[in-house]
């Protein structure tokens, strides 16, 4: 039973049901210091009803309450403070973790409901830069968290493969491009063309118009325009898939903006039939004044569609195809207004399922405080950064454990894991500066630090070479270090739920850091392998810790090496 539930039931019985179990659970607090107990109930809530001071009420409850399952229950001023029975709690938690293994913390909250997750979405014909990392790893982690809670996540890569920029790129290719040069080094050469043509289009309106015309041809199904565009797309996907392989990220569907190019007319017609489209300076808009939003521009004066038109078609397609219970968009915070408009247009059109669409924004990655910009050519390729991280990890592993057999494989797990973990430990709405030195460090709040704690436990268990009987676990919790681990293990299922509720993988990452820190304190304080009556209990405790550390890392898409 959950510790809050245990306390709430005992309290409700002690006060003769004046407050229900759920009401009590909602106001239970954690004392600031563990010396004051594990949980505390503020008696202020009962003062008015019982017509007594909170201090007197707390004292009466402490005397009356059934202390089964608790070491002690005491009144501290206006609070009733509960100290859990450490030994019983430890045995129960450890037994549960060892019995359930990687499934500890699983739940069926989602009951198999579909959750499409729009994530990653790099632009074709451009490098896969560090700027694309966040959407990719946050989306992947949320998918794993939701799957653990019984949902059916559907990871969709909504590639940026449609729009006027491709008309401009075709213009550049026709003017300056060479097929053989591009084939030899596709992304770099296409980037050069993209930067060159953007600079020209800013200075020369005729170049900009030519790009617009090529995109219009794409939308109208022009054979030459689509052939060149398809070639750009194919060479880009080869590069992207190689990088996804290094990241260990897979997708259920690659559905770029182009996939919806033949589905937009239906949504525009629907808006027209519902009298939602209004003409403004030759363009078609939806008025969103009642939502305190600017009008949504649905079609330009030349008939070309826009980003929001494609997203309207996308949303309708996903509802029809997946009948989602939630539809998540892991897209940067700068798109917040766009998603407000998108949901408002769908709401106006009578699609109440738009309430189940959630924009999951995130902060920006910078380098040296500067934003990455493909248009200006300021790009740091993610693949190069990952390779550098692996090299740095290998050097550190070489220094720590020169005889490690599978050094290269472990270096990949540590280097790539370090980059992913650093991103995911950052609160989603905050940005961060990309710093490999900090990421790949084995000290501090990093992925390698957590991985090393897991590997150290595995090393101890191999050295012990002893099978622990799950049915006969008895751990005397005589030190604060062991109790901190037990409390952390007990909290893991709630941590997973909280991460899901907030679409926040950093909750898992920070938990993994604190659990690794708790183990390292225990390791420094206790002789784990001492051959005494408590040996099996200690081995069971660290084995359970290893299981939960590994599962926390898995939910972040990070490997847990057995050796480091």
UniProtKB/Swiss-Prot annotation:
Major subcellular site: cytoplasm
Reactions catalysed: tRNA(Arg) + L-arginine + ATP = L-arginyl-tRNA(Arg) + AMP + diphosphate
Organism (species): Lactococcus lactis subsp. cremoris (strain MG1363)
Gene assigned in the entry: argS
Span of the annotated motif 'HIGH' region: 122-132
Protein name: Arginine--tRNA ligase
InterPro entries listed in its UniProt record: Arg-tRNA-ligase, Arg-tRNA-synth_N, Arg-tRNA-synth_N_sf, ArgRS_core, DALR_anticod-bd, Rossmann-like_a/b/a_fold, tRNAsynth_Ia_anticodon-bd
Keywords, sorted A to Z: Aminoacyl-tRNA synthetase, ATP-binding, Cytoplasm, Ligase, Nucleotide-binding, Protein biosynthesis
UniProt similarity note: Belongs to the class-I aminoacyl-tRNA synthetase family.
One MF annotation (Gene Ontology) recorded for this entry: arginine-tRNA ligase activity
Subunit and partners: Monomer.
GO biological process: arginyl-tRNA aminoacylation
The protein's Enzyme Commission number: 6.1.1.19
Cellular compartments per GO CC: cytoplasm
Places the protein is found: Cytoplasm
CDD domains: Anticodon_Ia_Arg, ArgRS_core
């Amino acid at each position: 039973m959950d510790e809050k539930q245990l306390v709430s039931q005992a309290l409700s019985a002690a006060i003769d049901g004046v407050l229900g179990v759920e009401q009590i659970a909602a106001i239970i607090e954690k004392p600031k210091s563990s010396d004051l107990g594990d949980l505390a109930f503020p008696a202020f809530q009962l003062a008015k009803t019982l017509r007594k001071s909170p201090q007197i009420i707390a004292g009466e409850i402490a005397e009356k309450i059934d202390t089964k399952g608790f070491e002690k229950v005491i009144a501290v001023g206006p609070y009733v403070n509960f100290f859990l029975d450490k030994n019983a709690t430890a045995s129960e938690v450890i037994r549960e973790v060892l019995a359930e293994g990687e499934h500890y913390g699983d739940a069926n909250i989602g009951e198999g409901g579909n959750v499409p997750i729009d994530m990653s979405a790099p632009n074709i014909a451009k490098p896969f830069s560090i700027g694309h990392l966040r959407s990719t790893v946050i989306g992947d982690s949320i998918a794993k968290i939701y799957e653990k809670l019984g949902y059916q996540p559907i990871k969709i890569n909504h590639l940026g493969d449609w729009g006027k920029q491709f008309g401009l790129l075709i213009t550049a290719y026709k003017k300056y491009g060479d097929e053989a040069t591009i084939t030899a080094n596709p992304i770099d050469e296409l980037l050069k063309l993209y930067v060159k043509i953007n600079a020209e289009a800013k200075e020369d309106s005729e170049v900009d118009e030519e790009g617009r015309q090529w995109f219009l041809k794409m939308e109208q199904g022009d054979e030459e325009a689509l052939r060149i565009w398809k070639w750009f797309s194919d060479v880009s996907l080869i590069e992207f898939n190689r990088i996804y392989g290094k990241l260990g990220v897979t997708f259920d569907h690659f559905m770029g903006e182009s996939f919806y190019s033949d589905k937009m007319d239906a949504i525009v017609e629907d808006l027209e039939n519902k009298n939602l489209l209004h003409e403004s300076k030759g363009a078609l808009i939806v008025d969103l004044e009642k939502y305190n939003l600017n009008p949504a521009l649905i079609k330009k004066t030349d008939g070309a569609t826009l980003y929001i038109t494609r997203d309207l078609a996308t949303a309708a397609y996903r509802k029809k195809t997946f009948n989602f219970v939630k539809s998540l968009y892991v897209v940067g915070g700068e798109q917040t207004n766009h998603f407000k408009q998108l949901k408002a247009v769908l709401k106006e059109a009578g699609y109440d399922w738009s309430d189940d669409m959630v924009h999951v924004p995130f902060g920006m990655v910078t380098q040296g405080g500067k934003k990455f910009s493909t248009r200006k050519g300021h790009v740091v390729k993610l693949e190069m950064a990952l390779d550098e991280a692996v090299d740095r990890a290998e050097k550190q592993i070489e220094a720590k454990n020169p005889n490690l057999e599978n050094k290269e494989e472990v270096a990949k797990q540590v280097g790539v894991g370090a980059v992913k973990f650093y991103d995911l430990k950052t609160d989603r709405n905050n940005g961060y500066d990309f710093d490999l030195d900090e990421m790949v460090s084995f000290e501090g709040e990093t992925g390698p630090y957590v991985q090393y704690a897991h590997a150290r436990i595995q090393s101890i268990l191999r050295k012990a070479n002893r099978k622990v009987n799950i049915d006969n676990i008895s751990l005397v919790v005589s030190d604060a270090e062991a109790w901190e681990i037990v409390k952390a293990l007990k909290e893991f299922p709630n941590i997973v739920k909280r991460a899901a509720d907030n679409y926040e993988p950093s909750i898992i990452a920070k938990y993994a850091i604190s659990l690794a820190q708790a183990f390292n304190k225990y390791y420094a304080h206790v002789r784990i392998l001492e051959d005494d009556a408590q040996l099996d209990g200690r081995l069971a405790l660290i084995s359970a810790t290893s299981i939960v550390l590994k599962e926390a890392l898995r939910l972040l898409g990070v490997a847990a090496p057995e050796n480091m």
